[in-house]
């Protein structure tokens, strides 16, 4: 059967459909479907039909303008749907981005597989003393990381063993002991550790996806969600290359500067030597401003 379509397609993204992109030790990302491309954004912005007579460089310039000036609705005309397998503790962080449609694997209806995440020793670090929500930059000593991994694996395996015991069923749903009555799956699951994997379908428009990527590809984002975001960023690059370039230029590699920060820069341009004490900024704001220009 010969399939044809009148909708816009992107050859680079078509080649990615249903392909498994590995993430972490057992996770993955798969592109399931998408709608629109760079031309869809331009079309919506111009409120016209078809690609029209505009040159590609004009389309690119318009996309740059739209992103630079924080226009949102043209980017909402593009959608993409992913199938993602990820650790539960990352899923709970991910779902904070509420502007998406999500359908997750049900551990009330089905039995979770015996797959759990263990971090690479290089990514095991102590708590940061500067940022209360993330780890420090340096890895812990080898002896410490080995102990951490042993504890995580031991706890995960023990909890999964008890999970099966509580249900009186194995991973495939087979009864373990005919003389024992197991409890409901919705109750048995509460004993599992957060490093077990879940799966979901996640559909989101391009505007909200770019917001997700801006936050989750940031170096301060947790490593385990950042690696997913980086893979999705590569997908966006293949899907909407003009938008990706504008996003990189104005969001990822650009910087927001406060009113006080601008005043400091103006004073410096005029030749004045400005230090933290004379800047009118608090210590953290000053450090962030200095970091931009390093």
UniProtKB/Swiss-Prot annotation:
It holds the Pfam family Thy1. Binds 4 FAD per tetramer. Each FAD binding site is formed by three monomers. InterPro entries: Thymidylate_synthase_ThyX (IPR003669), Thymidylate_synthase_ThyX_sf (IPR036098). Keywords: FAD, Flavoprotein, Methyltransferase, NADP, Nucleotide biosynthesis, Transferase. Pathway: Pyrimidine metabolism; dTTP biosynthesis. The keyword Ribonucleoprotein does not apply. It catalyses: dUMP + (6R)-5,10-methylene-5,6,7,8-tetrahydrofolate + NADPH + H(+) = dTMP + (6S)-5,6,7,8-tetrahydrofolate + NADP(+). DUMP binds at residues 93-96, 104-108, 189, 216. Residues 27-250 form the ThyX domain. It is an enzyme of class 2 (transferase). It comes from the Bacteria. Coiled coil: none annotated. GO terms for biological process: dTMP biosynthetic process; dTTP biosynthetic process; methylation. NCBIfam families: thyX. Belongs to the thymidylate synthase ThyX family. PANTHER family: FLAVIN-DEPENDENT THYMIDYLATE SYNTHASE (PTHR34934:SF1). Homotetramer. This is Flavin-dependent thymidylate synthase. It comes from Rickettsia prowazekii (strain Madrid E).
